[in-house]
Regions:
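N-terminal auxiliary segments of SAM/dcSAM-dependent transferases
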Residues: 3-8, 13-36, 40-170
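SAM-dependent Rossmann-like transferase core, predominantly class I methyltransferases
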Residues: 132-207, 211-223, 370-372
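Conserved SAM/SAH cofactor-binding pocket of Class I
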Residues: 190-276, 280-284
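Mobile active-site "lid"/loop adjacent to the S-adenosyl-L-methionine
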Residues: 276-301
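A short glycine-rich, Lys/Arg-flanked "PGG" loop and its adjoining helix->strand segment in the class I
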Residues: 299-312
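Conserved beta-strand signature within the Rossmann-like core of class I S-adenosyl-L-methionine
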Residues: 313-320
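Short, electropositive alpha-helical surface patch
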Residues: 324-342
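Class I S-adenosyl-L-methionine
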Residues: 336-383
C-alpha cells in the first residue's frame, strides 16, 4: 500500500477532484506492479485531450499519468505510444538481435507502464465504456483493503485477457478436457513439448514428480495416460493455485498433489519430469520466470538433484528448447557437459522443430534463430557406479 502525497492537475487533464478515476487528494491507495516497481510518488491526472506526443514527453520526464476519460481512447493512447518508440536496429548476429529486442521490450514496458488507472474498492474502473474489471482483479489480488487501487493500464489489460482465457479454457493436444490458465502462469500454447511427452510410453503405474509444474498440463497428460500419482512443485503461488484448480476440474485431484516449493519434493519417484525456463538471462518481472533462468541456475540445480530424487530404475525426462544455443547465450555442447558433471547419462533423446507462430514469422527480429529452433526430450538416468 502506498500513500499519494499529491495528485497534480495538468493542462491536458480535468480537475482531480472531479475526475471519476483519480484518487482523492492525499488518499491512501494500493499500488500493483508485476515488475515490482515502487509506487508513484505523484500522479498527474490526464484525459482524452492528451496527445500521444505530449504523453511521451511527460512520461520521459518521469511522470505517472493517471488516465480518466474513455477506456478505448486510453487503449489507443498505449498503441500510439508504442508506435513512437524506437525499433531495434538491424543486428549482425542472433545474440545482438536478442539483446536489442530485449532492450526495446523493456523500454516499451517502462514507457507504457506510466499510463495508470484507478479502481474503486470493488475494482471497478471509472472510465467511459470500460468493461467489468472486478472479477479479473479479484482473481489475481483477492479483496481490496483500500478504497482505491492504482495499476498500469497495460497490466490491467493483460489481466482482462487472462480472465477470458480462464473462463473459456484452452484445448491442449493430448489432454482430455480443457485447461483453464490463470493470470501470470505460463500459457501452454506451444504443442511441440506436449507431443514429445506423448511419445514416452512407459507411464502406466508410475509415481511422478513434476518440477516447475506451471498450469499442471504435463502432470495431467501423464495422469490421464495411467500414471499412478503426481507430486508437483512450483515456486510461484499462482501456478500452485492454477494447477490445483485444474486438477479438480479434470477429475484428477485425488492423484495430484502440488506444493509451493523450490525444485524437488521429499522422497523419490519413478519418473521426474521438468520443462524448465530455456533462456539463461535474468527475468525482468514475475511472469518472466517461466522463460528466463538467470545463469541457468534452475536447470543446473535440477540436474544436480535429479539422481537423488529417482527411485531405483527411475528416469528423468527433461524437455528443453535449443534457442539459447542458437542465440549464442549458451555454447554448443554445454548441456551435454552438464549431464556429465551431474553424473547423468542420456538413454535417448527425441527432437522436433518448433511450430509456434514466431518460428514462421519472417518479420520477427529473432527469426533467424527461431526458424531453426528445436525442442528435445531427454531421457536421463544416473551413471552406474
Amino acid at each position: 500500500m502506498s500513500r499519494a502525497p499529491r495528485t497534480d492537475a495538468s493542462p491536458e487533464g480535468p480537475n482531480p477532484s472531479t475526475s471519476p478515476s483519480a484518487p482523492p487528494l492525499d488518499s491512501a491507495f494500493t499500488w500493483h506492479s508485476e515488475s515490482a516497481e515502487p509506487a508513484p510518488a505523484r500522479l498527474s491526472p490526464v484525459n482524452d485531450r492528451l496527445s500521444a506526443d505530449t504523453a511521451l514527453k511527460r512520461v520521459r520526464r518521469g511522470e505517472f499519468l493517471l488516465y480518466s476519460g474513455d477506456f478505448h481512447n486510453a487503449k489507443q493512447l498505449l498503441g500510439a505510444l508504442s508506435r513512437r518508440l524506437p525499433q531495434p536496429a538491424k543486428a549482425r548476429s542472433p545474440l545482438e538481435a536478442f539483446r536489442a529486442e530485449r532492450r526495446a521490450r523493456q523500454l516499451e514496458h517502462e514507457t507504457l507502464s506510466r499510463i495508470v488507472v484507478s479502481l474503486d474498492r470493488d475494482y471497478r474502473l471509472g472510465l467511459a465504456r470500460a468493461p467489468d474489471t472486478s472479477l479479473a482483479c479479484h482473481q489475481v489480488w483477492g479483496d481490496s483493503t483500500t478504497d482505491t487501487t492504482v495499476v498500469p493500464l497495460k497490466q490491467l489489460l493483460g489481466m482482462l485477457g487472462a480472465a477470458e482465457w480462464r473462463r473459456k479454457g484452452l484445448a491442449v493436444p493430448g489432454l482430455t478436457g480443457l485447461l483453464h490458465p490463470h493470470y501470470g502462469v505460463y500459457l501452454p500454447t506451444r504443442t511441440d513439448y506436449v507431443e514429445l511427452l506423448n511419445s514416452f510410453t512407459e507411464v502406466k503405474g508410475k509415481r511422478v514428480f513434476d518440477i516447475g509444474t506451471g498450469t499442471g498440463v504435463l502432470s495431467f497428460i501423464l495422469l490421464q495416460r495411467g500414471a499412478a500419482s503426481v507430486q508437483a512443485t512450483d515456486c510461484d503461488s499462482r501456478a500452485v493455485a492454477c494447477s490445483r484448480e485444474n486438477a479438480e476440474r479434470l477429475g484428477l485431484g485425488k492423484r495430484f498433489q502440488v506444493a509451493e516449493a523450490d525444485l524437488f519434493p521429499k522422497g523419490t519417484a519413478d519418473l521426474v519430469v521438468c520443462n524448465p525456463p530455456w533462456i539463461p538471462e535474468p527475468p525482468k518481472n514475475r511472469v518472466d520466470r517461466a522463460v528466463f533462468d538467470e545463469d541457468s541456475q534452475f536447470l543446473r540445480r535440477f540436474l544436480e538433484g535429479l539422481s537423488a530424487s529417482l527411485a531405483p530404475g527411475g528416469v528423468g525426462l527433461l524437455l528443453l528448447s535449443d534457442l539459447a544455443v542458437l542465440l549464442g547465450l549458451r555454447p554448443p555442447g554445454w548441456l551435454e557437459a552438464e549431464f556429465e558433471r551431474c553424473g547423468l547419462s542420456v538413454q535417448w533423446a527425441r527432437s522436433t522443430p518448433a511450430r509456434h507462430s514466431k518460428a514462421k514469422d519472417a518479420s520477427d527480429p529473432l527469426h533467424m534463430a527461431r526458424s531453426r529452433e528445436r525442442t528435445t526430450l531427454y531421457c536421463l538416468k544416473p551413471v552406474s557406479p
